């Protein structure tokens, strides 16, 4: 039986800093609340990443001032290799992280962010399995981007010529893959937590066992009772 290639799970995260995280939630929440929401999301994603089997290495790639972290986040990040994001835009930062992990011997690299704290862990497992037969896998998000990208070899094409943060990220990426004849697999869609209505949706449809830290926080926020 053929042995599976070594696999790495990468979490992309911004260090929790007041006024710099989850700013679009500011329509409804204070800066302190936005910070608390982000920290809860980060905790949930770290627990998610720790729970998915099949990975030989787990990494946390930080942006921002990660030198000083809240104690609970510092503790939760201990099982991960802590690294720094490098690059002028998100595409270059993801490419550089993948390049680093492939150089260290990984044969499959999966990258997730912190915007989908209730993502079912099996989605990440599906991505890992898909990379046994295709060079690239994407998890589409409802806002036109993607919540996950994975690759079984280093490539630049998916990370160039994309307007990051726009609603055209996924469509442009698929166009690039087709133009360059790069095979890929699409996972089932999911949603990001970017705006207040996304939090209301999550609170109303919380799947059992998902996003426990965020669920606990939302139950304490008076704004949800208004």
Task: Label each PLM-derived region with a short phrase.
Residues 71-108, 169:
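Short phosphate-binding loop-to-helix
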Residues 110-112:
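Short aromatic-hydrophobic micro-motifs that form the base-stacking/packing surface
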Residues 1-25:
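N-terminal nucleotide-binding beta1-loop-alpha1 segment
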Residues 171-226:
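Conserved alpha/beta core of the MobA/IspD/sugar-nucleotide pyrophosphorylase nucleotidyltransferase superfamily
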Residues 55-64:
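Short beta-strand/loop segment that forms part of the nucleotide-sugar
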Residues 38-55:
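A short, N-terminal amphipathic alpha-helix
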Residues 117-143:
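Conserved donor-nucleotide/metal-binding helix-loop-beta segment in metal-dependent transferases, i.e.
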Residues 155-176:
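Short, glycine-/small-residue-rich phosphate/pyrophosphate-handling segment
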């Amino acid at each position: 039986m053929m042995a599976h290639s070594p696999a790495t799970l990468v979490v992309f995260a911004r260090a929790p800093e007041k006024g710099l995280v989850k700013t679009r939630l500011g329509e409804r929440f204070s800066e302190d609340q936005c910070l608390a929401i982000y920290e809860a999301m980060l905790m949930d994603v770290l627990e998610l990443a720790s729970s998915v089997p099949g990975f030989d290495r787990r990494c946390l790639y930080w942006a921002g001032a990660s030198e000083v972290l809240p104690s609970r986040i510092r503790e939760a990040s201990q099982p991960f290799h802590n690294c720094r994001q490098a690059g002028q835009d998100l595409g270059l930062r993801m490419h550089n992280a993948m390049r680093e992990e492939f150089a260290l011997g990984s044969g499959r690299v999966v990258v997730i962010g912190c915007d989908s704290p209730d993502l079912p862990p099996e989605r990440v497992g599906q991505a890992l399995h898909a990379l046994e037969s295709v060079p690239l896998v994407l998890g589409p998000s409802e806002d036109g981007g993607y919540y996950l990208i994975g690759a079984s070899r280093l490539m630049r094409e998916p990370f160039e010529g994309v307007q990051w943060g726009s609603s055209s990220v996924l469509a442009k990426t698929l166009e690039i893959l087709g133009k360059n004849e790069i095979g890929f697999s699409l996972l089932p869609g999911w949603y990001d937590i970017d705006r207040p209505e996304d939090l209301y949706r999550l609170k109303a449809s919380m799947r059992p066992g998902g996003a426990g830290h965020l669920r606990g926080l939302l139950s304490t926020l008076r704004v949800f009772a208004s």
